[in-house]
């Protein structure tokens, strides 16, 4: 839980640093400086230090454009007209605009029930993806839910690894994709969420407004946070082992439900490159709720890829922002 409080701690340390500097309290200044030095690893993954650069729609020759997005089931499940609500249509249009080669979507829902939307068919037909891997879980009558990988390149092999209970239905989705003469291994996943409900959000609001006992409202929230951290740590260990055994260059995308200062982040990422840190700037928030500092969605790639450009699509269609990265495969 230290990772969640890191932004506050960082601001406090920086504030004390400049406060001691103004007061010429050099011993205390040294303590603040030492804290910043010791926290360098966490600071380095928390902030993107690159200069803001416009994202170029036209890809460089040989670049692979990757999109990762938690689409929150496209907001709606049941049909209300032939094409869906304005939000669903906007989400599909935004995906189409990216001209991605590989599309990784979390919290994806589709259906073969005529009363619901067949989003697999919509993306294949409207966005022109020839290949996909969707190892689904049933979500009602002919309704299906999971993470999914779409590709314009052939998917030559695929696999699904389910995390141990009680984390189901979360799973690690894997696809081996043939890009010209090379094969890359793509992972996508959605890790254990905090499982906050409406009552928990009401408690948070009371904590913010100090309407009632801070301790009383904090206890159930802290319990859910601790449970989520433990489960995600187990999931992260599994991902780290599977990722390290890949015979191909690795591309990892997903919603980790954890911040960059966490065990989950460092274990899943390992030696991979974080596309946001390579080309992004600022705090890189990806989740619209709770806090303006929550970067919990990621695109990682191994050293055989270079990151040409990166962006977040800050459209409020889902509760997560879309991530887009152009990658170049070098000497696989």
Show which residues each predicted segment covers.
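Metal-dependent phosphoester-hydrolase catalytic domains
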Residues: 1-22, 29-33, 160, 230-251, ...
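Extracytoplasmic/secreted envelope proteins and their assembly/folding machinery
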Residues: 43, 92, 117-120, 147, ...
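Acidic/histidine-rich helix-loop elements
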Residues: 68-88, 109-112, 195-228
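Beta-strand-turn-beta hairpins that frame and shape the catalytic cleft
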Residues: 57-67, 151-157, 168-214, 305, ...
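Internal/C-terminal transmembrane anchor helices
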Residues: 24-47
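Active-site metal-binding loops of divalent metal-dependent hydrolases
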Residues: 71, 108, 191, 255-256
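Membrane-embedded segments
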Residues: 47-179
